[in-house]
């Protein structure tokens, strides 16, 4: 009698043991790859949602309801995109906490590129939050963009340019949709730089121990 299940289990363990990763890597090192997975999911679901979205203040909310109710599997895309955004932030905060705990901020290039990624992600999330153009979307767009007026000399001009007028209106929503669509591709570029810098410095080994010791 041959226990094929046990053999396949042992084979799988052997495959994982062949990976050049020492036991000094813990579960907290998973979140970087989880963030990349989140990014792929968000781009894929967002791409399909963009097919059915209308960047118009009178039609935006209706187009989202239409996606949820009438488009085949639209509700899955919409919910995955919304929940995926929350998961994205959970993962990135754990990822940052791990970096703070292990002193990864000492690796300045990787840390600065990561901080840039966080700012880009927060900007993308903000623009996406405004897109349904519900009551909270309107409030968020007004309050957050008004912060730009605090910039001396050209703050008011910058705010007017971002709004596309003297108040939040249709041009604002169009611009926010364009920015929400293009920023994830900027995040991909910044992530590539982050990963290149990461492997250049060997940030996966904060203790400085031999990765092949076991």
From Swiss-Prot:
| Record keywords, A-Z | Electron transport, Heme, Iron, Membrane, Metal-binding, Mitochondrion, Mitochondrion inner membrane, Respiratory chain, Transmembrane, Transmembrane helix, Transport, Ubiquinone
What does the note accompanying the cofactor annotation read?
Binds 2 heme b groups non-covalently.
> Which family is this sequence assigned to?
Belongs to the cytochrome b family.
Annotated GO biological processes are: mitochondrial electron transport, ubiquinol to cytochrome c
The domain of life is Eukaryota
The UniProt annotation places heme b b566 binding at 95, 194
User: What Pfam families does the entry give?
Assistant: Cytochrome_B
Q: Which PANTHER family match?
A: CYTOCHROME B (PTHR19271:SF16)
Q: Which gene encodes it?
A: MT-CYB
Q: What name has this protein been given in UniProt? A: Cytochrome b
Q: What parts of the sequence cross the membrane?
A: 31-51, 75-96, 111-131, 176-196
The subunit field of the Swiss-Prot or TrEMBL record says: The cytochrome bc1 complex contains 3 respiratory subunits (MT-CYB, CYC1 and UQCRFS1), 2 core proteins (UQCRC1 and UQCRC2) and probably 6 low-molecular weight proteins.
Q: What is its main location?
A: mitochondrion
List localization entries.
Mitochondrion inner membrane
User: Any extra detail in the entry?
Assistant: Heme 1 (or BL or b562) is low-potential and absorbs at about 562 nm, and heme 2 (or BH or b566) is high-potential and absorbs at about 566 nm.
